[in-house]
Amino acid sequence: MHSLKDLLADDCIADISMTGHYQGADEVCKGLQWPGPVMDLQRITFSNFVCRSHLDTAQQSAYSQHLYALEDHTHAFPFTFGGEWVNTYQKKNGKWKLSHIRFDLMFEDGNNSFVKDFWQLMDYSVFYGHTPIINPEIESPWIAIPYDDEPQSDAEQIFELEFKNNTGMDGGFFSLSHEVFTDDVFLNYAHHQNINKNYSGLADGDYHGRKAAINFFKGKQHKEARLQHNVSMAHLIIQNDQARAYMLRSEYHRIKHNIYDKTKIHMQPLSAVHEIDAKKENGVWKMMRMAYYPIMEFYPLPVECVCFDEYICGGNHWKRIKESIGIHV
């Protein structure tokens, strides 16, 4: 198994919102270390993975969620946090190496006493919660690498529609969302039953057309210092130039009335299902409909699973999940 240092260029740099700037492979390795006590559980899952490359340069982005916990005979004491990665790679002597690692903390919740003396945590009263490390208008993969050398399958392009929209919404870069939608896009958010941030006397509803859709997401974007829309690929049906995709939301810090006890710390919280209809326009897949269905399920997850997409997409796990939440496809 490769060590972290094997993956880094000798002159690699890292910029991490909680701890600062690091230069050189050895220092970067130190900067990425967990500074807190030895934990009984350390679970990390990645989602929203995008990577684009051109010649000898690649740009990759992803979201991660972390659940670290101590346990005694009766209770669990968890700390959850999540963030965004944008990493640059360079190919040298035929091998890809990380040349620049960027990480922005997006939320933290629970027993932050584990790290509060070592990390700059979120200031929820300010935009982004801290000085941003990542600028999506400059560093998101679609901007940094406008022409991808590696062709994508239809499935990859369809699932990436939501990854791109979420990057735009969470980072306040709504040009990405405009690129994703058809002109007549329809958002079916009536099931959300959340207070609309633009009109506080109303609940979320249905939104027709690109303008209404973008305005709806703009209203959501500023409700907190930073949002993190983690989604995992669950199921996809393609029929000629139309497709339906199912994505699962997971939010480690939004578990409603539940608590992380000794059982739930070993489970993946599922907070919503997104049903997405897409169609191909002039050879490009676009999102023409998204429906939002809130749920609250905890699904057993092996601690070694780092990508929930690979765990559920198209397999027996998805079959069990969809039956438990009443989806019939």
Language-model segments: what does each one mean?
Residues 32-33, 83-87, 166, 217:
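Short, well-ordered alpha-helical packing segments
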Residues 1-10, 159-180, 184:
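Short acidic-aromatic low-complexity motifs
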Residues 2, 26, 80-83, 156-159, ...:
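A structural signal for well-ordered alpha-helical segments within the folded catalytic domains
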Residues 21, 118, 175, 182, ...:
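Flexible domain-boundary/linker segments
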Residues 2-66, 183-255:
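A solvent-exposed, acidic/Ser-Thr-rich amphipathic alpha-helical stretch
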Residues 21, 78-79, 151-154, 158, ...:
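Aromatic-acidic/polar surface patches that form glycan- and anion
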Residues 36-153, 222-225, 233, 237-329:
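A beta-strand edge to alpha-helix "cap/lid" segment located at domain peripheries
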